[in-house]
Amino acid sequence: MKTALFSFLFSALLLLGCNGETPIQPDIPDELDETEILIYEEIQIPTKPAGTPTFTATETIDGSKGGYVKIKESYITEDDDTVLIDVKLKIKKDCFSGNADITMTMDDIYTAVSFSPDMVFENPVELDVKYKGLDPDQLNFPSGEYEFLYIDDDGNTETVPSYGVNVNAELGEISVKKAKLSHFSRYAFGR
């Protein structure tokens, strides 16, 4: 009895489903939803006194061995506050082929860092960035509203995978650990 009922239902499904008409197409709206564009504001560092150099470091890295590029600097603001900047780029072995002179440059206005030459990596490199002594007003947002971002030449942004952005507004501190960079460009904290 079950077999007969199953055969009848299956035959009915085939007859109703295969009637020679054009297949059903999903509804496609005339206007596509606009993609939400997130706009981030970069976080400013306190003004450097005149004559303070741009912080930069260059290291020759053998891609088969890997290596580090580090910047650990500080400066005194016009208000006699100290700003500390501690940045470390870790390049694991075999992220790229050959040797390269890799330059890391800290921005003079924002909590941002740029790299050269232009490179794309077979495996991501890791970046740790920490600023301390920033204006607390620049950090007056809940911690979850901060991101570490890749910023292209047109100002478009993309969140960089990391262990997260940590903020301590009282100390004027913001940091990111193990940000995964797949290529060199400009990266910054944004809110």
Regions found by a protein language model. Give the residues of each.
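Sec-dependent bacterial lipoprotein signal peptides
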Residues: M1-L16
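Bacterial Sec-dependent N-terminal signal peptides
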Residues: L14-K48, R191
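Proteolytic processing hotspots in large secreted/extracellular or virion-associated proteins
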Residues: L32-K65, C95-D154
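Predominantly extracellular/luminal regions of secreted and cell-surface proteins
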Residues: E59-A100
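Surface-exposed coil/turn segments at beta-strand junctions on protein surfaces, enriched
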Residues: S64, V120-E122, A169-G172, K180-S182
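Aromatic sugar-binding surface patches on proteins
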Residues: L127, G172-E173
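Solvent-exposed serine/threonine-rich low-complexity stretches and specific carbohydrate-binding patches
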Residues: T159-A169
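C-terminal beta-strand-rich structural cap/linker in extracellular carbohydrate-active enzymes
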Residues: S175-R191
